[in-house]
Amino acid sequence: MYYDSRPLMSDSADEKPRDSSSEMLWGFWYPALPGKRVRGRKLERAMLLEVPLVIGRNAAGKPFALRDVCPHRAFPLSFGRFDGASVECAYHGWQFDAHTGQCRHIPSLTADSKLKCERIYAGSFPCEERDGYIWAFMTNPEGRADAAAEIPPAPELPTLSPSYKIARLAADLPCSVDTGIIGLMDPAHGPFVHQAWWWRSRRSIRDKAKQFEPIPNGFRMSPHAPSANSAPYKLLKLITGEPATTMIDFVLPNQRFEQIRAGKYWLSSRTTVTPVKRDLCRLDFVAAWNILPWFPVVSFIIHVLGPRFIRQDTEVIERQGLGLKYEDRMMLVDDADRQARWYFELKAALAESRRTQEAMRHPVSGPVTLRWRS
């Protein structure tokens, strides 16, 4: 049985529901850029969900994110000056509070002007720093504040001990966010895209059975023994002397968490596929671990082999884009593609929940076992 990737809540490939690929998910945190890029009073440009942002730090080092458009003449605020508290537009000198976006000063106003500059706002977005990234909470395209909205804390990578190593990788993906995410969660491409003696090959393909369960805004591959046909997992057992388990979560809008545990040792990672524009995403990967920190095997795998994996995935997406120009309907085949289908159904359920103001109806009703070969 197969499914069209565009049906969201339907089991029929013959139906033709709306395409969700162009829909941006608002009301979530997204990583905007690495925190180390924003230093002193320097202003940095970023783009999330086709919204231009200007990002900086106040005098205390707290990050802020404004819509990079002056409400006066649409001049980019990122060309302006920042004094540690206010951003000044380089066109007419209008000044805006760095965190609220409220206009503080308009140099051209005379003393008897009736214009209340404090009623003018540049778009602003809640901003926090976690795991070496500056995150922006994308409320809406205009950056309008909603006093009634409850903003959750920014995502944070789970760590299981006070002392650990951490590493980060990034890459641009020339695709829509949906294409990037269903590629991220695809379990069957490894033996073909990531062939290597130290990873997998066509000869290593075998039957897999994994149990999944619902979690808020996502689903979990329940803790299980890692793939026996992957050399890094064999090496992990050799190093630690402990049997390993791995658990994988996907959480809307764009996060994949993986946690590997072997006795007292652990590795925790998060991968996000963030829409920059409708046809461009950014992949951000961060991992933390306490596995023999004095022995650089994990660091080597992440810094040397990790970029190779990402390049292979990027190349596949680039080539897939050549075909998507002519055919944007993709088949989703049970059970290997069920996670992709859940992703589309989660997006639809979230949209319906927001429309009706009712609790979201989760597409994964309970524990279920999926089977495929990889």
Where are these regions (language model features)?
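Rieske [2Fe-2S] iron-sulfur-binding domain
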Residues: M1-Y2, R6-A13, P17-S21, P31-T159, ...
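Short, mixed-charge, low-aromatic patches
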Residues: Y2-D4, S21-L25, R130-F137, P226-S227, ...
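A generic structural signal for short, non-catalytic loop/turn and secondary-structure boundary residues
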Residues: E23-L25, L48, I120, E129, ...
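Non-catalytic accessory segments flanking enzyme active sites
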Residues: L25-W26, F192
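Sequence-level motif detector for i,i+2 pairs with an aromatic at +2
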Residues: G27-W29, R41, A122, D131, ...
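Enriched - but not universal
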Residues: W29-A32, D97, R200-S201, E345
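C-terminal catalytic domain of Rieske-type non-heme iron oxygenases
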Residues: K62, G143-S374
